[in-house]
Amino acid sequence: MNWHKLLHNAWNSFLKKKKNNGEVIMPYLNSFAENYKTRLAVIERHLQRKDYNFGKWKAILIPKKDGGNRPLIIPNSISDKLVLKSISDYLSDSLCHLFNSVSSISYAYQKGKCTRDALVQLKRIHNPENILLKIDIKHFFDEIDKIILIQLLDQYQIDDYVKHLIYKGINPVIDYSNLKKK
């Protein structure tokens, strides 16, 4: 595992996303950025020693278009966000052969693909005899069986420690004390 490269790529992506969204850089982010190389080295050491621990995550509610609220569980720390992004990039690279097998029909959660690509493909294959079905499965991610997910990962050559981190990441310690509408 090249945690060094994964973490630096995650940091660059994280910082670029914050800047592109026009977000005000918050003090905690400035603090991290001032000595990011040292902070990334500390995270990397924990990952290499296989003793990285996620911190508490926070629960928040975000408004939905229909007037309701969608609960989100998000990491509090930049470190946790960078480790998760590193894992995501590692999985994308490790499982790209699976994505390639459905590349002409699947557009979700894949590097280099976006909603526009899906719409272009849809326009290309659309004819009056086809039916377009748009669905939203309520609580989809809540219904994923986490044990089955981990068992599926066992079928592929995924680093065992990464699987351990994934398990910890899908079963975080959650702080509900500040649950409020955002």
Regions found by a protein language model. Give the residues of each.
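Generic hydrophobic/packing signal
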Residues: D66, I78, L91-L95, H126, ...
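Alpha-helix initiation and N-capping motif
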Residues: H4-H8, Y36-L40, D80, L84, ...
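An acidic intrinsically disordered interaction segment
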Residues: L40-A59, L165-I170
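Non-catalytic, polymerase-adjacent accessory regions of viral genome-replication enzymes
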Residues: M1-H46
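Conserved polymerase palm-domain catalytic core
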Residues: R124-K182
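Short, conserved non-catalytic motifs in the polymerase core
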Residues: E23-L29, G55-L82, F99-K111, V173-K182
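Short, hydrophobic/amphipathic alpha-helical patches that form generic packing surfaces
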Residues: N12-S13, K85-D89, K168
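Active-site-proximal segment of RNA-dependent polymerases
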Residues: L84, S88-K146
